[in-house]
Design a protein with these regions (language model features):
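Conserved catalytic core of the tyrosine transesterase superfamily
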Residues: 1-282
């Protein structure tokens, strides 16, 4: 069996393992890219299974460290290789010789409220308005926006059930403005059950890249800073929620953070905001 066939089988096993662990398609795509880089580094005659750890370290040095790749890319590459050897060859690589790099926490970039209001008030598509407001007013990640179902909406209690990372469920708040917009969208689109934003066959989940591509156009149209992304809407939700006097523990739960330290970074951002979000959360 040639290496190309083996590599396809190995990548498939890695994908199956990631799915069992509830990891996202984006994570698998990143792992697959890292593994293809690893395979392409060696010639076709190389027996990947029998590589020594020093050979793998040389690859990491050449392709990540000397190439000046960012820490996140380095960590993904190392994690992908470790998982490959574990699930395909039952080999545990030495974490001391092949360590992960500690990531430097960056201060989140938020989309200011005034910019958000300009964008959403000028947006003609009701669907696009819903995407924007679910992140800005409820703190959803882009993948989570794509997965929202009619059954997840509890308008009576102003709550939304969210299917987050690792398929973990949590609840976040639904302001009146969001409920009204979602209700209008469902009426116009005649959506009574299932996904709010279905894929091409009206049953599958919409690809979140559709939202990302839409926001890329928004960035150009409104001349937004390069650091602004769709995720900046989620950062804005967290910042304005705390600026309005919201609870840090409640925010941790709504964002789906395992570690409270991840949430505390928004405290520093919130202290810099003199004006409140102006959004009625309950």
């Amino acid at each position: 069996m040639n290496n190309n066939v083996n590599q396809t089988k190995w990548i498939k096993k890695v994908e199956e393992n990631l799915k069992l662990r509830g990891r996202s398609q984006k994570t698998f795509d990143n792992y697959k890219s890292a593994l293809l880089r690893f395979f392409n580094y060696y010639n076709e005659e190389t027996n990947i299974k029998k590589l020594k750890e020093e050979d793998i370290i040389n690859f990491v040095n050449d392709e990540y460290i000397k190439a000046n790749k960012c820490k996140a890319t380095y960590n993904t590459g190392v994690a992908a290789i470790r998982l490959l050897y574990l699930v395909c060859f039952n080999i545990t690589l030495n974490k001391i010789l092949l360590p992960s790099s500690k990531l430097i926490k960056r201060v989140p970039t938020i989309l200011p409220r005034d910019k958000f209001l300009i964008i959403i008030n000028n947006e003609e598509s009701l669907k696009h308005k819903c995407w924007l407001i679910l992140s800005f007013c409820s703190g959803l990640r882009v993948d989570e926006v794509a997965k929202v179902k009619v059954e997840d909406i509890n308008s009576k209690e102003h709550k939304l059930k969210v299917l987050g990372k690792g398929n973990k469920e949590r609840y976040t708040i639904l302001p009146d403005i969001t409920i009204k917009l979602l209700r209008l969208y469902c009426i116009r689109k005649n959506i009574r059950t299932g996904y709010l934003f279905p894929g091409s066959n009206n049953k599958e989940v919409m690809n979140s890249k559709t939202i990302i591509n839409y926001f890329s156009v928004i960035k150009v149209d409104y001349n937004l800073d390069n650091n602004i992304s769709f995720h900046s809407l989620r950062h804005a939700f967290a910042t304005y929620y705390l600026a309005n006097g919201g609870s840090l523990l409640a925010l941790q739960s709504m964002l789906g953070h395992t570690d409270l330290n991840t949430t505390t970074i928004y405290l520093h951002l919130a202290q810099n905001f003199n004006e409140l979000a102006g959004i009625k959360y309950v």
